[in-house]
Amino acid sequence: MFAADGDTVSFEPGMLPRPQDTVLRKQTVSVFASTDLDRRLKTLGVKTVIVAGLMTHACVAGAARDAVPLGYHVVIASDASATRDIVRADGQKVDKDALHRAALAEIEDTFGDVMTTADITRLPLR
């Protein structure tokens, strides 16, 4: 689905990395498992991570779940994350919107906060 150098992994024109940005290429569902992100964040003294992206039920939830035992407070940007319809082995389809809501509910119920981007931008900077 996300093959290196494929069409699905290119940056959107309005979201191209700037020279000062760090781009990490992960090989696992969670960004923490296959990169040095934890070391980088700890070096910077980061205590809270805001997670957004694709797919809510997989990569977003995986990163959030892995961040908590590493000592981070997790906030999910609900309107900056999304997922896709999935078809189970028995042929039953799970709608993307229902899956997105369920993933956010699980995160909020167990290990993180879920907020809109508007609410996140109003958080105090530390």
Region roles according to the model:
Residues 1-126:
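Active-site-adjacent betaalpha module
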